[in-house]
């Protein structure tokens, strides 16, 4: 068996903070949108998050082979593998590393498919990618972050798709189409599909431990 792991280290330098200018009084300006990876060593945007692969080569139940697929990420929260590469939520981005020969080495820099996942609260950022049998990529958005999503590769790019958190979203990579699948569910972390394609998510909402999401539905929110 093979295990893909995202190692998420708390973002040490929110949104790539840096001083841009000064005059008679100090004036600090903050970049609201860090650039997408890759980030060279020494870059203020380079993080310590990484995606690793662990393999049990002799089927004894112990992972004996370990490999880093990509490192230097910042706030990488989930990974999903398809036939030709690897999807990663690295807010504010959804990125895709092609690996068409399946050698566990990225074929190049990632494609940035979506931009605009909120960074207001690192405990609630976009997370939990899973590839559905319908070809859509599903993910969750927690309780205290917004989103203003731009479909970077769409030929019919319209205005940003805005949401205020607490939802399950999905993305069709063949049509470059993003949409809100269902709203509500609190601080959602974790997305699962059962054998019939039904979608579930867990959260930290007291006595309620999770929701079954139906397309287009609107569930309880905690604000």
Please provide the spans of the model-predicted regions.
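Beta-propeller blade termini and top-face loops
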Residues: 1-223
């Amino acid at each position: 068996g093979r295990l893909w792991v995202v190692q998420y280290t708390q973002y040490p330098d929110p949104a790539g903070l840096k001083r841009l200018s000064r005059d008679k009084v100090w004036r600090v300006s903050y970049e609201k949108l860090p650039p997408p990876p890759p980030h060279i060593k020494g870059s203020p945007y380079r993080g310590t998050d990484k995606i690793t692969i662990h393999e049990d080569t002799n089927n004894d139940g112990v992972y004996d082979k370990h490999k880093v697929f990509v490192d230097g990420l910042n706030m990488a929260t989930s990974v999903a593998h398809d036939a030709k590469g690897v999807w990663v939520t690295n807010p504010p981005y959804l990125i895709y590393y092609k690996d068409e020969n399946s050698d566990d080495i990225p074929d190049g820099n990632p494609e940035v498919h979506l931009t605009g996942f909120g960074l207001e609260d690192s405990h609630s950022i976009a997370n939990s990618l899973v590839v559905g049998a319908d070809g859509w990529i599903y993910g969750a958005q927690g309780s205290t972050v917004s989103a203003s999503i731009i479909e970077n590769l769409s030929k019919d790019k319209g205005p940003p798709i805005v949401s205020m958190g607490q939802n399950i979203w999905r993305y069709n990579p063949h049509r470059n189409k993003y949409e809100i699948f269902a709203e509500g569910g609190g601080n959602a972390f974790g997305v699962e599909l059962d054998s019939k394609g039904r979608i579930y998510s867990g959260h930290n909402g007291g006595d309620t431990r999770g929701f079954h999401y139906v397309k287009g539905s609107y569930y309880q929110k905690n604000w």
